[in-house]
Swiss-Prot record:
NCBIfam families: PRK05298.1, uvrb
Keyword vocabulary terms for this entry: ATP-binding, Cytoplasm, DNA damage, DNA excision, DNA repair, Excision nuclease, Nucleotide-binding
GO CC annotations on file: cytoplasm; excinuclease repair complex
Predominant location category: cytoplasm
SMART domains assigned: DEXDc, HELICc
Membership in a protein family: Belongs to the UvrB family.
Protein name as annotated: UvrABC system protein B
One GO MF term: DNA binding
Motif (Beta-hairpin): 93-116
The organism of origin for this protein: Synechocystis sp. (strain ATCC 27184 / PCC 6803 / Kazusa)
């Protein structure tokens, strides 16, 4: 059941209500409806369903995830389903990013500082290159895809085409490469660089880690080869190739000169406005900064903070939305939004947060008003670019359901036959002793327990209480750093302890098949963590275990509780009837080694530079002069992880580096 474009490889066929969901989604999409929702319960194989839909439709697809970790997991799964097709990964390429900001109260200006991850930048370029050269493309992206990404037409036009047998002056080829931001280095060949030795020109494109070798005979291209950068082995001989720019932002010379004139005019107008309002310091600041930037732009075509002039460099009108990743897709592209109930609110919030920061910079003379157009898309601008979309969630939001109208397609039957958890509501009187008994039962069966509380204090108290009674327990809260969170979750799966307590264990994508019991304390206290959607998601953490149960400790039945229980019971009944009809006995889930937690985040086995860990743990007591040395060592580890495409590991190091830099900055203040 696949188109000629995509080749779906799966060790299983659609089962349960997957065939119906796949057929319904395809029918809806072929009927050219803009919005449809896949309401898929935990463990029902939503990713496989979407892979089947993509394969059948045969259209370039953008899969949007609400964080880098889930994007990485989805990308990995889809690459397994589509090994012969282009499954690309597009997330923010910053290892460290401190946006430019100004705090008027303390008169503190914070300059933009950023560290770009070279490997992720390569993957971003690989994504846009694939979109230009083929149709069998799936790009898995985070929300960063709604930020400006140059102009696709200019990017494509600037590519340097080469063909075997054609004639090119090597000097002109080199000039063209320099014009699209490649640099010459005859000693060390890295991504975005080239070298010329005799009649051989070697380039490492922005989207490759392999070398393209161009062999000239006079002005004729005699051979084009793809070379292994380490061994020098010829991997492939090519007939033709296009070398795409080293950066997505490509500005033709004539556009650059026009942009400089427009920047000059706006600066003069804004300086006059500030002076008229007696804001002389701001006027002087703006004039000085902008004149310096203009000088740099005219001399070298670049300046720090060049993105703030993107309205003019991209030749856009005031208020016109920037072109972003979605503009690199052909017209018939498909959008899939994973965990849409989380991703869509995130999509709405990006623009407002960005504009609030920019307004302060503009008002105080740090930036021209046009800097406000260096921004992410507004939600309505994004939807105008979308032709068709599938929302995917176990608990879709009201907005998604309204937009989908009658096209909400359910997928609640698990191929494994595992039922949704049994739910019990028990009074809060004696709840701790009751829970202790339940935990003992689970421990004897070598199963795991999740307990969610409303306060950090209660989580700590419960942890102490159970620990004193011999239960192997740990707790999770917001102050625990990323690396520790991951290590704790891994240790739970490995059986190093049996009970995990936390304030917010509501983690979409949290995949813990060993958990057979979820206990929700204060389930009747209405609020975000005890809303219907949150309760369903939390109860669902036990939905991968054949003996899954959830206990809600409450003295009242809230509306949210009633709805969550009713929905879970409804799904449980559907699965039960299906199992009886088809003679299915629920089977435990045997997750592959590269499951959702471990496939990108196998921290304890890959990070163990134990000494570095111990030094970092004591960083608060380190003399300030030692901090830069520690930062340097962490940066080396970060780059090493990035080279192995262990991007979440690299991100953990990035967060540590940022924490240490913040300490240094705080001291300077």
């Amino acid at each position: 059941m696949t188109s000629d474009l995509f080749s779906l490889h799966a060790p299983f066929r659609p089962t349960g209500d997957q065939p119906t969901a796949i057929a319904s989604l395809i029918e809806s999409l072929q009927g050219e409806h803009k919005f449809q929702t896949l309401l898929g319960a935990t463990g029902t194989g939503k990713t496989f369903t979407m892979a089947s839909v993509i394969a059948e439709l045969g259209r370039p697809t953008l899969v949007l995830a609400h964080n880098k970790t889930l994007a990485a997991q989805l990308c990995n799964e889809l690459r397994q389903f589509f090994p012969e097709n282009a499954v690309e990964y597009f997330i923010s390429y910053y290892d460290y990013y401190q946006p430019e900001a100004y705090i008027p109260v303390t008169d503190t200006y914070i300059e933009k500082t950023a560290s770009i991850n070279d490997e992720i930048d390569m993957l971003r370029h690989s994504a846009t290159r694939s979109l230009f050269e083929r149709r069998d493309v799936i790009v898995v992206a985070s929300i960063s895809c709604i930020y400006g990404l140059g102009i696709p037409s200019q990017y494509l036009k600037a590519a340097v085409p080469l063909q075997v047998g054609a004639e090119y002056d090597p000097r002109l080829v080199i000039r063209d490469l320099v014009n699209v931001q490649y640099s010459r280095n005859d000693v060390e060949l890295q991504r975005g660089r080239f070298r010329l030795k005799g009649d051989v020109l070697e380039i490492v494109p922005a989207y490759e880690d392999r070398v393209i070798r161009i062999e000239f005979f006079g002005d004729e291209v005699e051979a084009l080869r793809l070379i292994d950068p380490v061994s020098g082995e010829i991997l492939q001989s090519l007939d033709r190739i296009s070398i795409y720019p080293a950066r997505h932002f490509v500005t033709p010379e004539e556009t650059l000169e026009k942009a400089c004139q427009q920047i000059q005019t706006e600066m003069e107008q804004q300086v006059a406005f500030l002076e008229k309002n007696n804001l002389l310091v701001e006027a002087q600041r703006l004039s000085q900064r902008t004149r310096y930037d203009l000088e740099m732009l005219r001399e070298v075509g670049y300046c720090n903070g060049v993105e703030n002039y993107s309205r003019y460099l991209a030749d856009r009108q005031a208020g016109e939305p920037p072109e972003c990743l979605v503009d690199y897709f052909p017209e018939d592209w498909l959008l899939v939004i994973d965990e849409s109930h989380v991703t869509i609110p995130q999509l709405r919030g990006m623009y407002n947060g960005d504009q609030a920061r920019k307004k302060v910079l503009i008002d105080h003379g740090f930036r021209l008003p046009s800097a406000a157009d260096n921004r992410p898309l507004k939600a309505e601008e994004f939807w105008q670019k979308v032709k068709q979309c599938v929302f995917v969630s176990a608990t879709p939001g009201v907005w998604e359901i309204e937009q989908s109208e009658a096209r909400v397609i359910e997928q609640v039957i698990r191929p494994t036959g595992v039922l949704d958890p049994e739910i019990f509501v028990r009074p809060t009187t004696g709840q701790v002793d009751d829970l202790y008994g339940e935990i003992q039962t689970r421990v004897k069966l070598k199963e795991r327990v999740l307990i969610t509380t409303l306060t950090k204090r209660m989580a700590e108290d419960l942890t102490d209480y159970f620990s004193e009674r011999g239960i192997k327990v740990q707790y999770l809260h917001s102050e625990i750093q990323s690396i520790q969170r991951i290590e704790i979750l891994q240790a739970l799966r490995d059986g190093e302890f049996d009970v995990l307590i936390g304030v917010n264990l509501l983690r979409e994508g949290l995949d813990l098949p060993e958990v057979s019991l979820v206990a929700i304390m204060d389930a009747d206290k209405e609020g975000f963590l005890r809303a219907e959607r949150s309760l369903i998601q939390t109860i669902g953490r036990a939905a991968r275990h054949i003996r899954g149960q959830a206990i809600l400790y409450a003295d009242n039945f809230t509306d949210s509780m009633q709805k969550a229980i009713a929905e879970t019971e409804r799904r449980r009944k559907i699965q039960q009837e299906y199992n009886e009809k088809h003679g299915i006995t629920p089977q435990p889930i045997n997750k592959r080694a590269n499951n959702a937690i471990l496939q990108f985040l196998d921290i304890s086995r890959r990070l163990n530079s134990q000494q570095l860990e111990e030094v970092y743990e004591q960083a608060q007591d380190l003399p300030l002069e030692k901090i830069p040395d520690l930062i340097q060592q962490l940066e080396e580890k970060m780059q090493e992880a990035a080279k192995k495409q262990e991007f979440e590991v690299a991100a953990i190091y990035r967060d540590r580096i940022q924490h240490l830099r913040d300490r240094l900055l705080g001291h300077k203040k």
